[in-house]
Amino acid sequence: MYSLDDLLHLMNRLRDPQYGCPWDIKQTYTSIVPHTLEEAYEVADAIERGDFDHLQGELGDLLFQVVYYSQLAREEGRFEFAGVIDSITRKLIRRHPHVFPTGDLYAPLDVPQLSEEQVKQRWEQIKAEERAEKSDAPEQLSLLDDVPTALPSLSRAAKLQKRASQVGFDWPSALPVVDNVREELDEVLEAMAENDSAAIADEVGDLLFAAVNLARHLKVDPETALRGANAKFERRFRFIEQALRDTRRPIEDCTLEELDALWGEAKRQEKNMSSCG
């Protein structure tokens, strides 16, 4: 069975200027980013579908992205893969003092037990200290500085909101957020009445942001929830297509009422299957 060292050697061979792969040789940090995002989503997709037969391969594809960036950095004399492993190991030891109180990875497993809330508070404190260390002027730091701009918009909205909530800038419970969602929807309707396309886009953005806030207060991950909604829509629409294929009727010839009826049938069948399960 091949090892991590073999994968690193393979990556080095692929990037060999004389004998490597032309495609791999010309890649850069920036050109690989879309592939990295795609591989991460394929891992998430395999997990959500319960496709563990393919999960191992998808995790390998994602690991290869880390190896690729590390190879590029090694070629430029920045860091190596071993440094990546060392960095994350040190960070996790530092962030888990309740597990590694002495900072020794191999210390005896006899440590004081902390509550989940104590662990969470310590985790946030340590991350705040790490953010401060990244700046020469800690007093100018923003709590939002290290929220990646490249995150999917729903996830980034949730992270921005969570970060602000750490200093009390947050709704006290979910119910006021529901009212805020209604307010934002009303503002969308007002913009629609004025036929102001720029205002409509702005207000729809506010509505989405408020919906993410509601999800956060309900302890629902917005990206996961939306992926579930996407999967549900796809499943039901495929049901409509298959039902029409069975009757040899083009979907383009159907009225909206007929399509809605098939959509309702798809929902009923899902509900029946759920109750039987």
Regions found by a protein language model. Give the residues of each.
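Flexible "arm" and connector segments at domain edges
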Residues: M1-E58, F64-V204, L208-G277
